Every structure is written in C-alpha cells, then in structure tokens.
C-alpha cells in the first residue's frame, strides 16, 4: 500500500471531515465509515462505540478497515487539552502538545501507510480537534509519502473561524428542514456585521475579515511552523527573512487600504504600558468550545501573564528586557549566541529571533517577543485565568488578522526589522547592483479589457462557500453561505524594452505604491519604499533589440488563484494552473488573487507602478535537483517546497533598504526601470459570481 493512489489519498482526506464529530459516524459525501476497534473509539463512547460504529456501517456505502497496531502513541501531553478547548500555537503548553503529536505522525516509517492511517485515526479519536487538524496538516505536508493528500480548506472544516456565528444556527435549520437533494438558498452574510462606521477602524473590516486574507495567514504558518522536534520542518531556506518580508508586505498592503479611506498609516505599538484605544468585537463563536470569542474593550492594557494552564508566565518587564537585547544586537550589528560567542546579525537571524522560532540564536537573551506579544494582546481580559476565559482572536493564526491590533503590533515588528535595514551594518545598494547594462525599459503600461489605459478597476463580488463539511451533527448536503468581498478586473502589464546587448535572461520585478502620503504630499523615498507592494516577479528571456513583454495579472507570483481560496474539496485537480496536489499543499499558501489590487476610490486613487528588469546573473539560484520548478504560484510570499527561495536578492529588493543617493522615487529610476502613474477606481456595486451554484441564484 505504498503508492498514494485511489483509496490511500481518499481515506486520509476523510479525517478532516466534520472535525468535531466523532469518527464513529460516516464521513464524506459517500458516507464512508471507518471500522473502529475498541482502541480507536473516542473515550466518551467507550461503552457502546463499537456497536454504534457497526450500526452506522450497515448504511455506509464504503467501509474502511483499519490495521490494528502493536502499540499506539501515549500522547501524555497532548491528551491534557480538553476536546472542547480552543487551540493556539502561541501558547507554550500547546506548542509542546503539537510537537508531541507531529513527532508521532512523522515517526511512522515511510510507506507504512496503513500504520500511519491507524495512528492518525487513534489521534483523531483521542485529541482535541483543532490540535489534531494542525498536527495532521503539518505531517501530511512534510512526509514524503503523504504529500499528495490535499490539506482541506480550513474555512470549510472550521467555518466558525471565518464567519458570523448567527450563520450556523440558520445552517442547521436548513439541513434539518430541507432534504439533501432539494436546492438550498444560500445564507447571506451581511457585509457590516462586526461594527458600524462610527468606528473608523471598521472602514477596513472588508479587508481584515476577508476569508482569503485570513486563510493566507493560516496557511503560511502551516508551511512555516516555528517549532518542531525535527529541525528540518522549521529550518527552511531563509525562513526568518521570509517571516519579515511576508508580514512587511501585509503592513504595506494594509496601509495602502488605510490611505484609500483617508486614514493615517497604522501606528506602531511601541509603548507596551499604554492603553490600546482600538476595541474589537469579533462576533464569532467557536464551534469547538461552543463559546463566543472574547471581545476587547477600548483602552485596555497589557498585563503580566500568569496562566499555568497555558504554560504562560511572562511579565512586561521580560518583554522590555528582550527588546533592549534585540535593540543592542541591531545597534552593534552582532548577535550573542547561547554559547557566549557572537556572530554577525542578518535579517534572517533577526526574523527568527523576533518571532521567535527554534532557530533563534539565543532564546534566553532575546526571548520570543512576537509570539508573546500576541499572547499579551489575547489575554488582556483575563491575564491570570481567574475567570476561566480563553484567548482572543489575535492568538489564533486563522483569526488573528481580523483584529486591528494585529497591524499595530506588526507595525512595531516591521519597524524593528527596518531599523536593522537602515543601520550602518546593512549597506545601501550600489548602482552596479541595481542596474542592468544594455537593458533599457522604454515604456510600461497596464491594460484592462474594455477599460481605460493605466486604470485598474476594483468592485465587489459575492460568492458562496459550502459549510457542510464543517457543520457537525447535522444532515448532509450542501449548505451555502454567501459573502461579499473586494475583487479586481483582470489586467495585463505591457513592458517595452530595448536590449542593446546579446540575448539574455532577466528578472522582471513589479511593485506599486500610492503616489501621495496622508497629507496628499509627494513621498520621500525613505517612507515610500515601505509602501511598495509586490505585484509580481518572474524570469523572462530577452532577445537582442526591441522586446515587448505582456504578463497577465492572474499569473502573479504573489497570489494563488481564486479557486484555491474558495475551492470545493471534492473535485480535485480541475484547475489547469495546478500540476499536482503536493505543490498545492505548499503553494496553497499565497495572497488571494481577489485582493491583489488595493481598493482604490470611486473618484480614482493615484498610484505609481514601478517595473525593474534586474541583472539575472545576480538573481539566479542554483536549486538542489536542478531548476525544474514544480510550483510557480505564490513563491514570493511562500518560497518553494524542498527548494531554495527562488531569488538570490534580498526579499523586497530593491526597496528593502534605504537609498544612499535618491530622496524620491523619480531620482531612484535607472534605465532598466520605469515608473508609470496609474489610477485605481472602485465601482461600488456588487456582482454575483457566475460560478455560484444554480440553486443559489
């Protein structure tokens, strides 16, 4: 059973289905039943579980036999997490539990897939569903023999993390009243269900609460976990630098949206003892714990954390001490390792120190500032567990980007990394690093079918997502929720080049930034460089003489296709952009295509498009196992599976460092670069997705 064909892909997939329902019940649309022995029955069904399982098996279309193992993992730590608790990787106790479970899954010998399935079924029966889902996903992604098993869309298995809690009561009613084969009308999710525009931060709710944006963050942290016993799971190429770059781009994109709404750029949270004016009421319920996510009132403070149940005992003094040590490392350009020796500080080390991942050079000295900051923010309402309250949305990778404070915290993280980039130990780029002799960009433009030149068009779209895979304890059949989100008309870049040298390759780098700052003044480059959002990056052959490059927006190296954010789990592989599932599991991490372009304004927001054709001799990477890239999607944010990051330059190049000579973007432009004024215009209407199920129109 070592090949991953047919059943061996289908059966592991079923462990994602209806995560809060026990495995005794049928799974999947075909009502498949796992044949459980007493050892594999959940503890609460110990008396009659096998009998119930057999009874369900009588109606099943498929019965899945399970191999009986000589021994099962003890899960001494992981079994302590109650099945109805919420799970957060940011809590030390939960990290230890996750490490224990991932070890058990990774330690099953390769190609012993019956053993692997039985081990996972045992874990699924005995462990918290959210803990299981995370560990199972990481294991599937990192085992060579399971990488063809698709990681299920988290918004469909745990829909309560992505949408208004009132939806689920209505959804259960629909499944109970309407038979499975009757078309069901979608449940409409209103656009403004968490607040009103009296709260100015709410103007950005469409962006912060977007399903695709939150799925991106969840999937990125699945691909780049910060802790594991097997170092190789964490120690991926340039991982710390990617932590900086991906989050830097989130802040830049968020700031673009803020400017479109006449708001200032996000203010970093740097005084950790001052009140936090931003309140947040998530209006989400956890279907696992059957409780609402705790809100945060305005003007609450961080407080020292002492929650033994979570393994948290940290003071603000600890955080400030770690911060001083990080600042000293930045100001001296040196980092002190755990053994007392010192090494040069680079951005990759700084990212791992700040987060902190297990790759941090010295956890004792530099702590875990980023992760603990999330915990401080998540427990302001109950820092000592006096009220038995769980954490706020900011401590869960799938919900954290909903909270306005996420951006204030990450603005501080980004500012700390930028101080390193601006320090004397990181030299600005020289002209020879920026130029590409013989390559001259003569013009650049963007075109939209039937639209005005150099104008990008955004609009609202409403789409349906099927909730039935996450609706535990209800009848089968599709139940759709319809929600509205920002989208953009497809466009293409047209770049004209004169190459006076011989034929060669080049890397095309495309960025965009608002033309004016909050005061409607022209930016200084020192500020605008942090506002440039990466739109695309690709390698292109150039002929001698005149060349014209056209590139579609849907081919962006930053994004994943729309279908991957809102895909149904069953019809796999119909997307021509996806070569195989293994790459999807990795490349499923990526910025959502529908959020590629900032919202703009109805009057038209002024942006600048920047295009650079860099010298490929300085860009190219020698990949292990050759340069055959299996997955081109979203490599800018997510790297490539089992390979080096596909660009030798610093992430964010050429804007990751200040310029020593240019004071504004016009001064920065060399012959191999071009700048083009463009307009982003919002059409404030809602269009139906033509792919919505016919029953739902």
From Swiss-Prot:
Residue ranges crossing the lipid bilayer per the database entry: none
Subcellular location(s) per record: Secreted
Primary location group: secreted
GO MF, any single term: metal ion binding
Propeptide: 1-101
Free-text tissue specificity from the UniProt record: Expressed in hemocytes.
Glycosylation sites: 260, 313, 498, 552
Enzyme active site: 355
Annotated keywords: Copper, Disulfide bond, Glycoprotein, Melanin biosynthesis, Metal-binding, Monooxygenase, Oxidoreductase, Secreted, Zymogen
Record-level GO BP terms: melanin biosynthetic process
Catalytic reaction annotation: L-tyrosine + O2 = L-dopaquinone + H2O; 2 L-dopa + O2 = 2 L-dopaquinone + 2 H2O
Keyword Secreted: yes
Cofactor note: Binds 2 copper ions per subunit.
Disulfide bonds: 587-631, 589-638
Pfam families per the UniProt record, alphabetical: Hemocyanin_C, Hemocyanin_M, Hemocyanin_N
Sequence similarity: Belongs to the tyrosinase family.
Subunit structure, as described in the record: Heterodimer.
Record-linked PANTHER family: LARVAL STORAGE PROTEIN/PHENOLOXIDASE, PHENOLOXIDASE 2-RELATED
Protein known as: Phenoloxidase 1
């Amino acid at each position: 059973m070592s090949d991953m064909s047919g059943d061996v892909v289908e059966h592991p997939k079923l462990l994602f289905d209806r995560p809060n329902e026990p495995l005794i019940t049928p799974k999947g649309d075909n009502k498949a039943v796992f044949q459980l022995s007493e050892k594999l029955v959940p503890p609460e069904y110990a008396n009659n579980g096998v009998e119930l399982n057999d009874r369900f098996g009588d109606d099943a279309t498929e019965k899945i036999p399970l191999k009986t193992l000589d021994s099962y993992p003890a899960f001494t730590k992981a079994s302590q997490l109650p099945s109805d608790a919420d799970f957060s990787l940011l809590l030390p106790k939960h990290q230890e539990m996750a490490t224990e479970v991932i070890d058990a899954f990774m330690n099953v010998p390769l190609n012993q897939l019956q053993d692997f399935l039985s081990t996972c079924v045992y874990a699924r029966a005995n462990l918290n569903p959210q803990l299981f889902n995370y560990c199972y996903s990481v294991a599937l992604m990192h085992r060579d023999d399971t990488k063809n098993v698709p990681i299920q869309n988290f918004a469909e298995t745990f829909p309560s993390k992505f949408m208004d809690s009132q939806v689920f009561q209505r959804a259960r009613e629909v499944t109970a009243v309407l038979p499975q084969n009757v078309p069901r009308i979608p449940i409409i999710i209103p656009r403004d269900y968490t607040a009103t525009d009296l709260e100015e931060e709410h103007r950005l709710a469409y962006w912060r609460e977007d399903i695709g944006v939150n799925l991106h963050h969840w999937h990125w942290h699945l691909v780049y976990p910060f802790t594991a016993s097997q170092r190789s799971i964490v120690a991926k190429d340039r991982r710390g630098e990617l932590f900086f770059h991906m989050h830097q781009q989130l802040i830049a994109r968020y700031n673009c949206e803020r400017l479109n709404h006449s708001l200032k750029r996000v203010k970093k949270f740097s005084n950790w003892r001052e009140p936090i004016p931003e309140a947040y009421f998530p209006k989400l319920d956890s279907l696992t714990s059957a409780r609402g996510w705790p809100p945060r009132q305005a003007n609450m403070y961080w407080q020292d954390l002492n929650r033994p149940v979570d393994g948290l005992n940290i003071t603000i003094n600890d955080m400030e001490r770690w911060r001083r040590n990080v600042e000293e490392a930045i100001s001296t350009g040196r980092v002190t390792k755990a053994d007392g020796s010192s090494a040069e500080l680079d951005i990759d080390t700084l990212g791992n120190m700040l987060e902190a991942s297990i790759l941090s050079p010295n956890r004792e000295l530099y702590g875990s500032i980023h992760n603990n900051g999330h915990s401080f923010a998540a427990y302001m309402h109950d820092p000592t567990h006096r009220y038995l309250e769980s954490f706020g949305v900011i401590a869960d990778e799938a919900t954290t980007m909903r909270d306005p404070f996420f951006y204030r915290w990450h603005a501080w993280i980004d500012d700390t990394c930028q101080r390193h980039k601006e320090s004397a130990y990181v030299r600005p780029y020289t002209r020879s690093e920026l130029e590409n002799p013989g390559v001259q960009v003569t013009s650049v433009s963007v075109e939209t079918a039937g639209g005005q030149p150099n104008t990008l068009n955004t609009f609202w779209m409403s789409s349906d997502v099927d909730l039935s895979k996450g609706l535990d304890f209800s009848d089968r059949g599709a139940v759709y929720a319809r929600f509205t989100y920002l989208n953009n008309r497809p466009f293409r870049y047209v770049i004209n080049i004169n190459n006076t040298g011989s034929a060669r390759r080049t890397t095309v780098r495309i960025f965009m930034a608002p033309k004016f700052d909050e005061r409607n003044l022209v930016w200084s480059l020192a500020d605008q460089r942090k506002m440039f959002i990466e739109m695309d990056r690709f390698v292109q052959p150039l002929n001698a003489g005149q060349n014209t490059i056209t590139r579609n927006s849907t081919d962006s190296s930053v994004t994943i296709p729309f279908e991957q954010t809102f895909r149904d789990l069953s019809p796999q592989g119909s997307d021509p952009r996806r070569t195989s599932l293994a790459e999807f599991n990795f490349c499923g991490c990526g910025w959502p295509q529908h959020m590629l372009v900032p919202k703009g304004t109805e009057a038209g927001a002024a942006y600048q498009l920047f295009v650079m054709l860099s010298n490929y001799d300085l860009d190219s990477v020698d990949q292990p196992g050759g340069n055959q890239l299996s997955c081109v999607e979203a490599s800018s944010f997510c790297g490539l599976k089992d390979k080096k990051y596909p660009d030798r330059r610093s992430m964010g190049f050429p804007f990751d460092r200040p310029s020593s000579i240019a004071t504004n973007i016009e001064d920065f432009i060399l012959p191999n670069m071009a700048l083009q004024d463009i307009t982003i215009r919002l059409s404030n209407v809602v269009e139906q997705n033509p792919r919505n199920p016919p029953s739902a129109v």
